[in-house]
Regions:
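Chalcogenol-based redox active-site neighborhoods
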Residues: 21-244
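Bacterial N-terminal signal peptides
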Residues: 7-15
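Positively charged n-region of N-terminal signal peptides that target proteins for export
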Residues: 1-4
Length: 244
């Protein structure tokens, strides 16, 4: 009888744990989902997201806290890249659980810093105040196994139709690679524009991939090239040059 009770208890715990994990995952947005909406105050005024940004690519960055070393370097890097993001038609939104007044003080301070011996930059993108944690919980930015009051380093790339196209999560001790985020953004834009795929370690301007057929064609078909810009390494591996 005792053994049966132990077995039932272990079974109940396993089922409860699996249910809890599924419930947590189910509560977070996934790739292809509509970006959760929110209204909040920011350093540039009130934001109604994503309505204010529909029709544009946008990236939401969550960070643990203002006036912290890693977060400060990340925002200074983004400040240096503002012109590039504008060129790509991308709107940036920064979010944490800090107060709006703290955001404002932090921005003012960072705008005086000569980061990497460069002139100080003016930070034009909004920093959203999420003191009540509502937005953070909607997006899965607050993950209990890391911290219950601060966001992880989240990145959400959202397309002009307000669909989530890519997500990244970094631990609090590791700064984000802005070049990789930029690469992913341009890869998504390239894939959408040309109906192509991007290979491993692809860089903007590099050769892209075409969708492969499900079954190998005969050798005569394999030898055919529809364009001088198209080349094949195998029936399932077809590349195309976008830029000569």
């Amino acid at each position: 009888m005792k053994q049966i009770m132990i077995t039932l208890t272990m079974l109940f715990f396993s089922v409860w744990q699996a249910w809890s994990q599924q419930n947590v995952i189910a509560g977070y947005p996934m790739l292809g989902d509509n970006a959760p909406s929110f209204t909040a105050q920011s350093t540039t005024g009130k934001i109604n997201f994503p309505k204010d940004y529909t029709g544009s690519w946008k990236i939401i960055f969550s960070h643990p806290a203002d006036f912290t070393p890693v977060c400060s370097t990340e925002l200074l890097e983004l400040g240096e890249m503002q012109d590039d993001f504008n060129k790509w038609g991308v709107k940036l939104i920064i979010l944490s659980t800090d107060k709006l007044s703290t955001h404002q003080q932090w921005v003012q301070s960072m705008e005086t810093i000569r980061y990497k011996d460069k002139d100080p930059v003016k930070i034009d993108f909004p920093l959203v105040a999420d003191e009540d944690h509502v937005i953070s919980k909607k997006y899965g930015m607050m993950q209990p196994n890391t911290n219950t009051t601060k966001d992880v380093r989240g990145v959400y790339i959202i397309d002009p139709q307000d669909k989530i196209r890519a997500m990244f999560f970094y631990p609090m001790s590791v700064g984000r690679n802005m070049d990789e985020i930029k690469r992913t953004l341009i890869a998504l834009q390239t894939a959408d524009q040309h109906n192509v795929l991007t290979p491993a370690n692809w860089q903007p301007g590099g050769d892209v991939l075409l969708q492969s057929t499900k079954n190998p064609p005969d050798q005569s078909e394999l030898a055919k090239q529809t364009s001088p810009d198209v080349y094949q390494l195998s029936w399932y591996l077809t590349f195309m040059k976008l830029n000569k």
